[in-house]
């Protein structure tokens, strides 16, 4: 019997994502000035206010207020009508030094023996539902909002009422064997200007104006947004959007009040959006604001890198990888692999895990080096998912007080590279 499965995403203007992006932008500035920085930065955003907290060990000095305001401005919160404006919001910092007790468990005389920054479990996942080897429900949810933001920033004349905050949700019908059959429901809630005024002050006139706005936005989503997003996908996905697919746009009827004025945002509150949309397990640790000595982040990236390369190599059609660490210990405590019955090799999942341990050095320092994580690469991860993204080289520019304007070439999303496929095929005899 077929079944339905759903994932959601949120836009860069969602309050929790505003917080994530500020935290990661601050991390990037520390990384560009001192790649050995230890950073744990948390952000809270609310009406007219940003609060920064956390722990840092670094030789760098960064302008926290300027960074926060730049991020807010780039997202699009640049009008006083939003009640959260880059130029007028307050920015308070309570960031202080890192605990010496934590640091003594991480730093070692030999860098390769660097201990894990904390205990914990981390998961990586890959499947064959999309070209990016990500779940279709989440991939579509991200794509819808990424394109909506692009329209808002680059082609605003098409949907001139758009504001930064938005959410999406995609439900897909799957076969009993777990293959996507059709897109059942798409939900999009997007913040907008109050662009149709009521004829008079009555509640009835307001309801009519609200209904007209909702109808206009729904039509624009159907006519402009959906065709652009579906065109990115193979024909089988395009066919999955059929005449029976339900489209729900701003189901409450109106979404004018939004962003940090509508809801308080916090770093690390969208961990399922950041990862696999509920299709795979999550260890519970958030990513944003954390330097790669925190295995919550770096080991989760390594686990995705392993899972994606295993699937791309043909070892299995679906792979879940779990890693576990103890604080201050370099080697992982355990490595677990689950292929969910989709393996194409004559090995048990436990035997696959043993080969993974032989092929990949999973000590924190080795992960940092292999994936080039001691670099200012994190702001880009903080919206539209950390996984399923296109690895690429870019030059990023930073304004600093100590070194002026700095240009830095980096590789983004290195954990998405399929650079171990040949090695794995050889080791698994494929």
Q: What is the predicted function of each stretch?
A:
Residues 48-50, 154-179, 313-351:
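A structural-propensity feature for long, helix-poor, extended segments
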Residues 6, 66, 73-257, 388, ...:
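Glycine-rich, mobile lid/loop segments that gate access to catalytic sites or pores
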Residues 8-10, 14-19, 115-130, 256-281, ...:
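Conserved phosphate/anionic-ligand binding catalytic regions in large, soluble enzymes, centered on
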Residues 46, 318, 325-430:
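Internal helix-turn-beta structural module
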Residues 8, 12-31, 126-150, 290-314:
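Alpha-helical support elements that line or immediately flank enzyme active sites
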Residues 39-59, 327-331:
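Short, charge-patterned binding micro-sites
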Residues 271, 276-320, 331-338:
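C-terminal catalytic subdomain
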Residues 1-40, 421, 427-430:
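N-terminal, positively charged regions that mediate nucleic acid binding
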């Amino acid at each position: 019997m077929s079944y339905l499965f759903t994932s959601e995403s949120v836009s860069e203007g969602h309050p929790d994502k505003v917080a994530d992006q500020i935290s990661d932008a601050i991390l990037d500035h520390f990384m560009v000035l001192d790649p050995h920085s230890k950073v744990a930065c948390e952000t809270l955003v609310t009406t007219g206010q940003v609060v920064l907290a956390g722990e840092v060990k670094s030789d760098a000095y960064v302008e926290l207020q300027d960074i926060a305001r730049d991020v807010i401005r780039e997202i699009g919160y640049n009008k006083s009508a939003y009640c959260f404006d880059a130029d007028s919001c307050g920015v308070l910092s309570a960031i202080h030094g890192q605990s010496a007790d934590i640091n003594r468990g991480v730093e070692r005389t030999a860098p390769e023996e660097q201990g894990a920054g904390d205990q914990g479990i981390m998961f990586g996942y890959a499947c064959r539902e999309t070209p990016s080897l990500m779940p279709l429900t989440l991939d579509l949810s991200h794509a819808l909002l990424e394109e909506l933001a692009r329209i808002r920033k680059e082609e605003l004349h098409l949907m001139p009422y758009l504001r930064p905050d938005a959410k999406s949700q995609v439900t897909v019908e799957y076969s009993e064997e777990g293959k996507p059959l059709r897109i059942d429901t798409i939900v999009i809630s997007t913040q907008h200007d109050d662009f149709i005024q009521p004829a008079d002050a009555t509640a009835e006139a307001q309801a009519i104006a609200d209904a007209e706005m909702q109808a206009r936005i729904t039509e624009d989503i159907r006519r402009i947004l959906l065709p652009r997003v579906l065109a990115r996908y193979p024909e089988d996905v395009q066919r999955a959007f059929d005449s029976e697919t339900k489209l729900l746009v701003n189901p409450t009827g109106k979404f004018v009040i939004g962003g940090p004025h509508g809801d308080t945002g916090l770093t690390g509150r969208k961990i399922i959006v950041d990862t696999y949309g509920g299709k795979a397990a999550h260890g519970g640790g958030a990513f944003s604001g954390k330097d790669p000595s925190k295995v919550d982040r770096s080991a989760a990236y390594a686990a995705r890198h392993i899972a994606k390369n295993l699937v791309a190599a043909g070892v299995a059609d679906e792979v879940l990888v779990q890693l576990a660490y103890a604080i201050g210990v370099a080697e992982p405590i355990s490595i677990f692999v689950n292929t969910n019955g989709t393996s194409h090799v004559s090995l048990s999942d436990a035997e696959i895990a043993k080969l993974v341990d032989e092929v990949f050095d999973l000590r924190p320092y080795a992960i940092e080096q292999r994936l080039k994580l001691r670099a200012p690469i994190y702001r880009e991860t903080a919206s539209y998912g950390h996984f399923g993204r296109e690895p690429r080289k870019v030059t990023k520019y930073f304004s600093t007080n100590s070194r002026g304007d700095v240009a830095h070439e980096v590789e983004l999303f290195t954990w998405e590279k399929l650079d171990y496929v040949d090695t794995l095929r050889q080791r698994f005899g494929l």
